[in-house]
Design a protein with these regions (language model features):
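A short acidic, Gly/Pro-enriched loop at the edge of an enzyme's catalytic core
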Residues: 95-105
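A short glycine-rich, Lys/Arg-flanked "PGG" loop and its adjoining helix->strand segment in the class I
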Residues: 120-132
Length: 210
């Protein structure tokens, strides 16, 4: 995974545009009734960025570990929430956490940058660090977004593309069935949202570890 992209290009731009305080309109709130979000839990915000969802879970009394590949994003997060535990992590490598460490692993638009082999390994790692009965909650880009990106991507493997030096995976239901086969589905919804004034075609999901 390209560490330089996230430090030099992505967060260089979006640190100026994102709002860490805006936590009440986050999509996960619509599913609070399904995951007992007010019960104190050990949460991993995997691919946390600057930490909007970290703050969301902290505000509800959870113990949160925030992990990202970007040193710049983690420095910003630590400056704004000094008490949070941060771990720099490349998700194409084994996760730096203990077996059965977390009640919730949360990954907002952060696991769709990997090849089939890397994605398979990542989901196995997420299952490893989740407690039995723990929740894997997140979102990924949908294959319905292909029409918006087809003119500037090169296909590397099925549903996996290079976009100007950055890899991106687009997900459909079959991929959830394959990669998440050892998890129990609670929620799987395809949605269209607006992000930074652009249309975002994505899946929202909640799965439960066995």
């Amino acid at each position: 995974m390209n560490k330089n992209y996230w430090d030099e290009k992505y967060w260089e731009k979006h640190l100026r545009e994102d709002d860490l305080e805006n936590v009440e309109e986050l999509w996960v709130r619509k599913y609070e009734h399904l995951i007992d979000v007010n019960e104190h839990r050990n949460v991993l915000d995997l691919g946390c960025g600057i930490g909007q969802y970290t703050r969301y879970f902290l505000n509800r009394g959870h113990h949160v570990t925030s992990s990202d590949i970007s040193k710049k994003a983690l420095e910003y997060l630590k400056n704004n929430i000094p008490t949070v535990r941060i771990v720099q992590q490349d998700m194409s490598e084994p996760l730096k956490f203990e077996d059965n460490e977390f009640d919730i692993v949360f990954a907002n638009l952060s696991i769709h940058f990997f090849s089939k082999e890397e994605t398979d390994n990542l989901i196995k790692e997420i299952r490893r660090i989740l407690k039995p009965g723990g929740f894997f909650i997140g979102s990924v880009n949908s294959t319905s977004a292909y029409e918006h990106i087809k003119d500037h991507v090169v296909e590397l493997e099925e549903n996996f593309y290079d976009s100007n030096g950055r890899s991106i995976r687009l997900w459909d239901e079959k991929q959830f069935e394959y990669f998440f086969k050892d998890l129990d589905k609670i929620v799987l919804n395809e949605v269209i949202e607006k992000r930074w004034d652009k249309q975002k075609n994505m899946w929202e999901f909640i799965y439960k570890n066995k």
